[in-house]
């Protein structure tokens, strides 16, 4: 049930960010670590321009939205696990900024299908 959005600098092509391999490992990691039922949904959104500290810079940000009731410690643990996974699939090491956010879905959330 997790909703995962990966925003990334468009110029990080498959040689610099292996999105397919990352997604294959990300889904089971998030479902297992968050103790979620169902399957995760992952959306990749390329951004033509990304800036860090006012300078154009490559960047990858993962947002994970879950149903409420996870503790801050559980969310932090999941963020750390996903950040470590990102490090395995984003080439360029410290030259690419990576971040992860785990948040609750709003009460209005509904799913069909």
What spans do the regions from the language model cover?
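A domain-level signal for the structural core that forms small-molecule/cofactor-binding pockets
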Residues: 1-113
């Amino acid at each position: 049930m997790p909703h995962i959005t990966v925003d990334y600098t468009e110029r990080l092509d498959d040689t610099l960010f292996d999105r397919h391999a990352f997604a294959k490992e990300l889904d089971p990691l998030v479902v297992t670590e968050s103790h979620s039922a169902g399957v995760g949904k992952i959306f990749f959104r390329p951004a033509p321009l990304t800036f860090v500290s006012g300078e154009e810079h490559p960047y990858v940000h993962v947002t994970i939205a879950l149903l409420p009731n996870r503790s801050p410690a559980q969310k932090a643990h999941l963020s750390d696990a996903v950040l470590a996974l990102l490090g395995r699939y984003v080439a360029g090491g410290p030259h690419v900024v990576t971040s992860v956010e785990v948040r609750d879905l709003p009460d209005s959330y509904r799913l069909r299908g």
